[in-house]
Regions:
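Short amphipathic alpha-helical segments
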Residues: 3-5, 55, 83
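Aromatic-flanked redox-active Cys/Sec active sites in thiol-based oxidoreductases
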Residues: 8-9, 73, 89
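Flanking helices and flexible, charged tails adjoining ferredoxin-like Fe-S electron-transfer domains
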Residues: 31-61, 68-69, 89-174
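N-terminal cysteine/histidine-rich coordination modules
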Residues: 1-11, 16, 21-42, 46-47
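Ordered, amphipathic secondary-structure segments that act as subunit-interaction surfaces
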Residues: 61-84
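The canonical Cys-X-X-Cys-His
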Residues: 18, 22, 71, 102
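A generic structural signal for alpha-helix starts
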Residues: 10-13, 17, 66, 93, ...
Length: 174
């Protein structure tokens, strides 16, 4: 059954446990590898006062992924079983088109100059286990939710994150 990634910024307290769990799950080497999840502090200065919010940023596994559309090498596929957007890093030539296209900055080039992103803990989900970031989040700000085929898409969450991040990418949704 396909999964949808949901993120609720009102529940994120920037504790970082999701990012650490992700790094542990993926055997990320700090200072060498690009973490698949990062915590971002967001400041809103509108309305005469400063409001601080946080966002845990990682691949949202969009239903119609722009990274897949812009990749000329065909490195991205949507897994038929889980709906996760998977990356074949070995086929990547490091052009960076996907990095520039992602509206929330969830794709990065690693130290080898190849694209890198969250794999959604596919193997965990197939075993009926939560993704590492979801398991670690005490406030349940991150959820991988099983959805029926054709269920509502993820554009609302991606657009919200894009707007909150102020990425200068026009608030595009996947």
């Amino acid at each position: 059954m396909p999964f949808r990634v949901e993120f609720d910024p009102s529940e994120c307290v920037a504790c970082g446990t999701c990012a650490v769990a992700c790094m542990d799950q993926c055997d990320t080497v700090i200072g060498v590898d690009v973490p698949c999840r990062r915590i971002v502090t967001l400041e809103d200065h509108s309305g005469g006062k400063t409001v601080i919010r946080y966002a845990s940023v990682g691949c949202m596994h969009c239903r119609d992924p722009i990274c897949q559309r812009v990749c000329r090498q065909g490195c991205y596929t949507v897994d038929a079983e889980t709906g996760l957007v998977l990356l074949n890093g070995a086929a990547c030539v490091g052009c960076g088109a996907c990095v520039k296209a992602c509206p929330i900055g969830a794709v990065a080039l690693n130290s080898a100059g190849k694209a890198s992103k969250c794999n959604g803990c596919r193997e965990r989900l197939l075993l009926g286990l939560p993704a590492a970031c979801e398991r670690a989040c005490q406030n349940q700000a991150i959820r991988f939710t099983a959805v029926e085929s054709g269920a509502e898409d993820d554009r609302e969450t991606v657009t919200l994150l894009s707007r909150l991040l102020g990425s200068g990418k026009g608030g595009r949704a996947c």
